[in-house]
């Protein structure tokens, strides 16, 4: 076997919460009169909440905001987002993803989540994967967001697997960079795959089965 563990990004790989994020950020930005569209939203992929806020505030021309005010804005966005996440269910977990996860586990691989989101445990519970993974490294136990490799390095440590024996699965270029900086190979889907950011650039997560076999 080429790898002993697979570490998955959550959003855009296991499930998609893009639309929930977009609507929450847009509601916050609209309330402050800040222009916000899907082009700006695309820059937020794989980026932490506070770093995302700073990107949005590039278009803000009002009075200077204190750190406390910025924290309140980020919290407001998260409240809107978390409320919308209550609509998520196991139906938001694509069948091909669940089948691939089950197959990889059956092959004896350790499986983990590596996500910058502090909402990771809630989302996993909503889609029926609460407690399913061998390890979950997320925004609640890291201090640096992607492209810093911390989230993936911690996931590997939690699994007890050397970095070079871990495969990272990502859909964001910043996440692919994080995996590489952590000394891991990376398989990409979505935008990251289109940009050729991975060691393998996939059209479907099902390709992971052959990739991990080597």
Model-derived features: where do they sit?
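Asp-based, Mg2+/Mn2+-dependent phosphohydrolase catalytic module
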Residues: 1-4, 98, 102-105, 117-214
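Active-site neighborhood of HAD-like aspartate-dependent phosphohydrolases
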Residues: 1-42
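Short, acidic loop-to-helix structural element flanking the phosphoryl-transfer center
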Residues: 2, 83-113
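Conserved SAM-binding loop
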Residues: 14, 93, 113, 144, ...
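Short, surface-exposed alpha-helical segments at coil->helix boundaries
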Residues: 18-23, 50, 121, 149
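Short helix-capping segments at alpha-helix termini
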Residues: 31-34, 61-65, 128-132, 160-161
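A metal-dependent, Asp-based hydrolase signature
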Residues: 46-84, 103
């Amino acid at each position: 076997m080429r790898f002993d563990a697979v570490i998955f990004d959550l959003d855009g790989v296991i499930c998609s919460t893009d639309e929930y994020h977009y609507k929450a950020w847009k509601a916050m930005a609209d309330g402050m009169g800040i222009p916000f569209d899907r082009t700006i939203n695309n820059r937020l992929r794989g980026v932490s909440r506070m770093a995302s806020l700073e990107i949005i505030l590039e278009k803000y021309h009002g009075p200077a905001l204190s750190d406390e005010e910025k924290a309140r804005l980020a919290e407001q966005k998260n409240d809107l987002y978390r409320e919308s996440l209550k609509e998520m269910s196991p139906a938001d977990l694509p069948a091909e993803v669940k089948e691939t996860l089950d197959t990889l586990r059956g092959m004896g691989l350790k499986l983990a989540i590596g996500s910058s989101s502090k909402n990771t445990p809630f989302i996993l519970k909503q889609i029926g994967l609460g407690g399913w993974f061998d390890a979950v490294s997320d925004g609640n136990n890291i201090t640096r967001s992607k492209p810093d490799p911390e989230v993936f390095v911690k996931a590997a440590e939690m699994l007890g697997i050397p970095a070079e024996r871990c495969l990272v699965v990502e859909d964001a270029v910043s996440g692919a960079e994080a995996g590489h900086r952590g000394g891991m190979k990376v398989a990409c889907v979505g935008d990251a795959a289109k940009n050729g950011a991975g060691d393998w650039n996939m059209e479907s997560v099902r390709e992971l089965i052959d990739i991990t076999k080597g």
